[in-house]
Amino acid sequence: MAGKMKLFSVTSERPLATKIADYLDIPLCEVELQKFSDGEVKINIEESIRGTNAYVVQSMNSNVNERLMELLIMVDALKRASVHSINIIMPYYGYARQDRKARSREPITAKLMANLIQRAGANRLITVDLHAAQIQGFFNIPIDHLSAIPLIGDYLIENYGEKDVVVVAPDHSGVVRARRIADRLNAPIAILNRKPRPHEDEIMSVIGDVKGKVAIVVDDIIDTGVRATTSADILLEKGAVEVIACATHSVMAGNATERLQNSNIKEVITSDSIDLPEDKQFDKLTTISIGRILGRAIEGVQENRSLHPLF
């Protein structure tokens, strides 16, 4: 298998790529990335990869525009090195929240992302918990849409399975995600009824019974942390005994880590789809690795096996 498969990490996800490499028992290929004084990026692959299947790990975290350009340049380098196939492992798909025209004269940037990745020469995308599942339809290449929900669910069963819990969707669009966790915990669900506002949604009511229960709020992304902390405050006000926040992707923009650490949330559970630097770590944070499921997905693609057990 190692002779046919090559694994690369560009810049954003070296720790996760290392875990994937450890699972697959292959080395990470050496990539030299240079940045010129004007910000231009140049990539050089340090070994012959002709005829191989290339797997590139790159999330759209931190500076999403820079990460995207690095990925496109990497894909071009691989194509010109005569690889057999180019498979993108993008745990966190950037611009996913711009998946439709919410108002007139707005772009659909999630679709533009798909166009750029395909036009550059990618043959497949493996991603995790897209903000909007319909983004899969923006591509004309195979998409493997994996989920960290089973891993988060297993952690919750182990640590909160004996408690009286309720799984909370932070809005109506998150009900399906919350239901998947609730089914694993054999727990009821509740929904936060939000009224959209320009800068911060207003929670109008809680649909469901949370009194006396451990409320587990399940989302796909924690960005600024405002949504998670305001959800916790209203749930505690309605009688929840404690609040746990779960999300696959921890963007942690601005002062999110400080906000979450100082909030009424007991624990924040997330995955390593985004590599958080040391200054973004905090005591309440629990990180669950998705390296194994990504490694299994790569194995399945490489060996032409079904990925159904991973969904």
Swiss-Prot record:
Q: In which pathway does it act?
A: Metabolic intermediate biosynthesis; 5-phospho-alpha-D-ribose 1-diphosphate biosynthesis; 5-phospho-alpha-D-ribose 1-diphosphate from D-ribose 5-phosphate (route I): step 1/1
The residues listed in the UniProt record as binding ATP, with positions renumbered to this chain, are: D38, G39, E40, R97, Q98
Give the residues the record marks as binding Mg(2+) 1: H131
**Binding residues for Mg(2+) 2, per the UniProt record?**
D171
Q: Which reaction does it catalyse?
A: D-ribose 5-phosphate + ATP = 5-phospho-alpha-D-ribose 1-diphosphate + AMP + H(+)
**Which E.C. number(s) belong to this protein?**
2.7.6.1
EC supergroup of this enzyme: transferase
Cofactor(s) this protein requires: Mg(2+)
List localization entries.
Cytoplasm
GO terms assigned for molecular function: ATP binding; kinase activity; magnesium ion binding; ribose phosphate diphosphokinase activity
What cellular component GO annotations does this protein have?
cytoplasm; ribose phosphate diphosphokinase complex
List S-S links within the chain: none
Q: Where does D-ribose 5-phosphate bind?
A: D219
Keyword Manganese set for record: no
Q: Which domain of life is it from?
A: Bacteria
Cofactor binding description: Binds 2 Mg(2+) ions per subunit.
Which CDD domains does this chain map to?
A: PRTases_typeI
Q: Which GO terms describe its biological process?
A: 5-phosphoribose 1-diphosphate biosynthetic process; purine nucleotide biosynthetic process; ribonucleoside monophosphate biosynthetic process
SUPFAM superfamilies the UniProt entry points to: PRTase-like
Keywords on this record?
ATP-binding, Cytoplasm, Kinase, Magnesium, Metal-binding, Nucleotide biosynthesis, Nucleotide-binding, Transferase
Q: How does it assemble?
A: Homohexamer.
- Role, per record: Involved in the biosynthesis of the central metabolite phospho-alpha-D-ribosyl-1-pyrophosphate (PRPP) via the transfer of pyrophosphoryl group from ATP to 1-hydroxyl of ribose-5-phosphate (Rib-5-P).
Similarity section: Belongs to the ribose-phosphate pyrophosphokinase family. Class I subfamily.
Please state what the protein is called.
Answer: Putative ribose-phosphate pyrophosphokinase 2
**Protein source organism:** Listeria monocytogenes serovar 1/2a (strain ATCC BAA-679 / EGD-e)
- Gene that produces this protein: prs2
